[in-house]
A protein has these predicted regions:
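Rossmann-like AdoMet
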Residues: 2-143, 147-236, 240-244, 402-404, ...
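Generic structural "secondary-structure junction" signal
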Residues: 89, 96-97, 103, 109-110, ...
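Conserved RecA-like P-loop NTPase ATPase core
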Residues: 117, 247, 337
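Short, well-ordered beta-to-alpha junction loops that form the rim of enzyme active sites
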Residues: 145, 250-252, 336-339
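Conserved protein kinase catalytic core
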Residues: 180, 256-257, 343
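A short SAM/SAH-binding and catalytic strip from SAM-dependent methyltransferases
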Residues: 229-265, 309-313, 317, 325-327, ...
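A mobile, often basic/glycine-rich helix-loop segment
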Residues: 246-300, 348-359
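Long, Lys/Arg- and hydrophobic-enriched amphipathic alpha-helices
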Residues: 291-464
């Protein structure tokens, strides 16, 4: 499903231009999406020409003041720079000081819908770990752990088996001080007295100046979970200790910054974000670079046939780092996210209170996201890692016997709990809900080719 990123009307006749950019003019708004990352169609008809006479612009936020000052000083920012500021600005970023997940937040994720989801992820990791002889120690690494629900459900399964319980440790990559506290409460029941994430950035720089890359003391927080498993928090993946690792990135890559490019008769141009002091509904607007930018020259494939493209260099760096670790230390990884195979170009959007929201409206108050280009990730790890998928979430979970797990739980459940279990199952696997919209991609070191040829990864093939 393609989502038009041009989510506001730009009235004809805008006169404000910059030396390196043109205002984008277009005729209408047509945004499709889904509640909690999926919803119903809304907005204006794409073919009609609407004229807006806005009496009042949208509310100004603290982050908007910061963005306006930055743009006034240095010029329009890229969409990638905008996303990074909106989501992770230390003072006013969306993720930094609030609970954004669940019914009280802006999005709902699979682990929050059913504990079975995390249990099956743990089962998958245990299966792949067993295939290669159960190497020790075993690091479970989650990127962007949300509330900690997925990790908590996985550890409950790991702790049931002595082989894994005695060797496993949990490593969480999290930049948000608030979310790291929620994760610690969920996993450990207490919050340790430690430096916050912002102070950890200074610690990160110091450690990389004065310690070896192999140092295992780069965490900014450490505790013991309710299951007796050591858990540590890190601001960067590079701080996580090296070893045989099971990587899980659930709805993580879709929040990483993307550059947006548009094909014109003069070649590729980058979409930028500028101040709008005119009659637009918000204080910011999209503009088009007048010429090629360094990003458009470097990131757009000369053979690209789409008219618009989104590229996330940060995603590329991270997936390559994971591939290198798998190649050097062994392990496996799962990327679970909304995404496509390189066929889409306009997916940048925002969510607030479980509904689509204009990305330029009141920055810092809504979640920003862009679908993951799985073909881009696979291309970047080619030769370093084996990849399987992406396949739909519903297919993966059915192959992992989620229905059998559901039937077992229903036998001992009350009527009310049975209703909840069935509803959660439908939400996770149904094609018109999350079943087709979320995708699973697996990564393995290339030296596992022979093993995986004989015994393909669980979940990616139908069980016998």
């Amino acid at each position: 499903m393609t989502v038009n990123f041009l989510t506001r009307i730009s009235p004809a006749g805008l006169s404000h231009t910059l030396k390196n950019s043109w205002p984008i003019k277009f005729q209408g708004l047509w945004a499709l999406g889904f509640t909690a990352r999926f919803s119903t169609e809304f907005g204006l008809h794409p073919r009609r020409n609407y004229s807006f006479h806005v009496q009042e612009k949208s509310r100004e936020t603290k982050l908007l003041h910061h963005l306006r000052a930055r743009i006034s000083a240095t010029g329009p920012v890229t969409v990638a720079e905008y996303m990074k500021e909106v989501l992770t600005n230390p003072m006013s970023g969306y993720y930094m000081h609030r609970d954004v997940i669940g019914s009280s937040g802006d999005v709902i994720t699979s682990p929050e819908i059913s504990h079975t989801f995390g249990e099956l992820i743990a089962k998958w990791f245990l299966n792949e770990w067993t295939k290669v002889g159960k190497p020790k120690p075993l690091y479970v690494v989650e990127l962007g752990p949300g509330r900690g629900t997925l990790s908590d459900d996985m550890l409950r399964v790991f702790s049931q088996f002595s082989d894994s319980r005695e060797v496993v440790s949990l490593h969480l990559v999290e930049v948000s001080p608030h979310l790291s506290q929620l994760q610690e409460l969920k996993l450990c029941g207490t919050v340790s007295v430690v430096k916050d994430v912002l102070e950890a950035e200074d610690r990160h720089r110091h450690l990389h100046l004065h310690t070896s890359p192999e140092s295992e003391e780069n965490f900014y927080k450490h505790n013991i979970t309710k299951h007796g498993v050591p858990v540590s928090w890190y601001r960067h993946l590079e701080d996580v200790p090296h070893g045989f690792s099971c990587f899980i990135a659930h709805e993580f890559f879709d929040a990483l910054p993307v550059h947006k490019f548009q094909k014109t008769h003069e070649g590729w141009r980058e979409i930028l974000i500028d101040i709008d002091d005119n009659v637009g509904p918000h204080h910011l607007r999209y503009v088009l670079s007048r010429g090629p930018t360094p990003a458009s020259k470097f990131f757009v494939d000369p053979k690209e046939t789409r008219s618009s493209v989104e590229v996330s260099p940060e995603s590329g760096v991270l997936v390559q780092d994971i591939a290198i670790r798998l190649e050097q230390e062994g392990g496996c990884g799962l990327v679970v996210d909304y995404g496509h195979d390189g066929s889409k170009g306009d997916t940048f959007r925002a969510f607030r209170r479980h509904a689509l929201h204009d990305p330029l409206c009141e920055p810092g108050t809504a979640d920003l996201t862009a679908d993951v280009d799985f073909s881009y990730l696979k291309k970047l790890v080619q030769g370093r890692a084996l990849t399987y998928g992406p396949i739909p979430q519903g297919m993966f979970l059915e192959n992992m016997s989620i229905k059998a797990r559901l039937e077992k739980l229903l036998k001992s459940a009350t009527p009310e709990l049975q209703k909840q279990l069935k509803s959660g199952y439908e939400m996770l696997v149904s094609s018109d809900k999350m079943g087709d919209r979320l995708k699973f991609l697996a990564l393995f070191p290339t030296d596992m080719q022979e093993v995986l040829t004989k015994t393909p990864p669980a979940g990616f093939v139908a069980p016998p």
